[in-house]
Amino acid sequence: MLKSVNILNKRARFDYEIIDTYTAGIVLAGTEIKSIRLGKANITESFCEFSGIELFAINTYIEEYSFGNQFNHKSRSERKLLLNKKELKSLHKSVQAKGLTIVPLKLFTNEKGLAKLQIGLCKGKKNYDKRESLKEQDTKRDLDRIKKAYN
């Protein structure tokens, strides 16, 4: 049984309002998938960009595989994302027209052991929106504490 890997981009939910989510496959080298299975990846500073009709994840950090030889991968390189043509067209259209952006939300392995990247079509939050979301989190946390105390 394979150990599942979940690497989250916690910053994305704070900085962006997520409109829609998609699950995409990633084109990886052998040493890259081995590093991901060990949990040695980071997607907090990464973003997605179109090059022609293809979508790439840029600035995704996957640590070099410790047992690799001279044919090891680069830690920060563009990685092609695999989506249906219909999904790519709709994403491309919405990014061009509405000023939205595509941000990686979660890097995980599925039940077959393949690496997948959950991406979100997002709109940037303003500073006052971020403050409001912080206030909502604080009030929710306080309510949970009160409920726990009386139960």
From Swiss-Prot:
Cite the InterPro entries for this sequence: SmpB, SsrA-bd_prot, SsrA-bd_prot_CS
Q: This protein's superkingdom?
A: Bacteria
The entry's keywords:
Cytoplasm, RNA-binding
State any GO BP term from the record.
trans-translation
Indicate where this protein resides in the cell: Cytoplasm
| Pfam families per the UniProt record, alphabetical | SmpB (PF01668)
Q: Matching SUPFAM superfamilies, A to Z?
A: Small protein B (SmpB)
Assigned GO CC terms: cytosol
Named from the GO MF annotations, one term is: RNA binding
Please give the Gene3D superfamilies that the UniProt record associates with this protein.
2.40.280.10
Stated role: Required for rescue of stalled ribosomes mediated by trans-translation. Binds to transfer-messenger RNA (tmRNA), required for stable association of tmRNA with ribosomes. tmRNA and SmpB together mimic tRNA shape, replacing the anticodon stem-loop with SmpB. tmRNA is encoded by the ssrA gene; the 2 termini fold to resemble tRNA(Ala) and it encodes a 'tag peptide', a short internal open reading frame. During trans-translation Ala-aminoacylated tmRNA acts like a tRNA, entering the A-site of stalled ribosomes, displacing the stalled mRNA.
Family assignment from sequence similarity: Belongs to the SmpB family.
Q: Which protein, by its recorded name, is this? A: SsrA-binding protein
